[in-house]
UniProtKB/Swiss-Prot annotation:
Residues bearing glycans: 165
Family: Belongs to the dicarboxylate/amino acid:cation symporter (DAACS) (TC 2.A.23) family.
This protein's name: Putative sodium-dependent excitatory amino acid transporter glt-4
Keyword Magnesium: no
Binding residues for Na(+) 1: 351, 355, 440, 444
One Gene Ontology term from the biological process aspect of the record: L-glutamate transmembrane transport
Localization annotation: Cell membrane
Cytoplasmic topological segments: 1-7
Gene that encodes it: glt-4
Species the sequence originates in: Caenorhabditis elegans
Transmembrane segments: 8-28, 50-70, 87-107, 194-217, 227-254, 276-297, 343-369, 430-451
Binding locations of L-aspartate: 320-322, 359, 400-404, 433, 440
Topology of this chain in the membrane: Multi-pass membrane protein
Amino acid sequence: MAKLSKENLLLLFTVLGVVVGIGLGFSLRDPSKAWSKRHLSYLRFPGDLFVQMLKMLILPMIMSSIITSLASLDSGTAGRLGMVSMIYYTLTTFFAVFLGIVLVSVIKPGKWTTTNIEDLVGHVKTTPCVATAVDTIIDLMKSCFPENLIEATFRSQKICLKFFNGTTEIPPEIAMTMSPEQRAQFTEVPEKIVSDGMNILGLVVFSVALGIVIGVIGEDGKPMKNFFKSLEACSMKLIGWVIIYSPVGITFLIAAQIVGMKDPGQELHRLMGYVITVILGLLIHAFVVIPLLCVVLARRNPIKFVGGMAQALLTALATSSSSATLPLSIKCCEENNKVDPRVTRFVLPLGATINMDGTALYEAVAAIYISQCYGNDLSLGEVVLVSLTATLASIGAAGIPQAGIVTMIMVLIAIGLPTNLFILIFPVDFMLDRLRTTVNVHGDSIATAVIERLCEDQLQKGGHHLDTNDQGYSMLSTNASPDPKRITIGNNCENSHML
């Protein structure tokens, strides 16, 4: 009862933090005088600390949890988990894209705007990287196998295209405004760009391989398995401490974002049709499609399940980062919704990297909306191209704030539009980014229940459940109880097993 009260109290403070952050943000806004970046950084400082503490724990948590989970399974069970996860994630992403295309084609929000596109394009601050869909696929495959594992913990690579007129390089800001036909007149040279940021996909692939190998070699792998079990327990305990600070961090993150907006009302009015379309799509996917999958495939009560994920969803809303929310997602799935830790610690890190339903839906809507604003009606083939490219772009999107605006450039290239037209939607991206991140985290969490149900037989045959006291399952709570609990998967009381 004391544990339940403490968890409810933390959730209450998290909700209160959201409300206080909104109120504080609007009360500190001064329409006549904008805040300087320095002053905004001061206001955002407590929130930045919260996000950085979460990100600090991502690396040890991801590697230790995946390795420990898969080391407890036989190779057949691990393979089944991976195959089912990939199929499920791909299908839900495709459906999200399809839903977005249907809504934007019916509502036609691009016809609502009176925006002067030429004025916007002329004042855009461009992104100095142009890449095609093929380049992105190649980047994705290469990211799975980093040549230097240590470098992958803090640096990632991608391919950017540079254009030359003879020996003279075309400035990236000019290349971005050109159509594919115009770019074809110049020499195209792909170049590898190294950027700061963890290569999570590469670390996940390595951890999966290492975990399977540790399980295969048996007794010889026990020292490694015990090491990662201890590392996981420590990571989870640290996460539990960081989460206590979450209401404070969330308050100042939201307040700083609101204070930094130039004119929320004017920007929202200009993009009203687009915002309505995206939000409607996200609501349908989050409250109809995903809960339906939860009922039909997982045989769980979606309302109760979402209630157990409330704290993670609020954190996703505040941080707009599925990667930063990952530690809390694992905690909520395991402690509140009683999902098998072997599933959560494999499925959630993978989902935070490649399962971006909300991002995929947003990219499909945004690309067609921009095309409508530009006066370009897409053909059926171009719509199909948008769906495929949006799916690939969402898979390649990093779980960081506003990663979707970067992958949007790839979708615009695919349909032949100037890439700097993303400025049309940029003013409201901060808000939609938080909503689509919340949908991403929501979809990942439901995926754990679905995959647990679909792989139930293999999980029962593939090895014992994780020892929650050794591995930190209970360590997420500051006053965890060592007593095991018997739970059931779905509504099947005959298939109960120990956690």
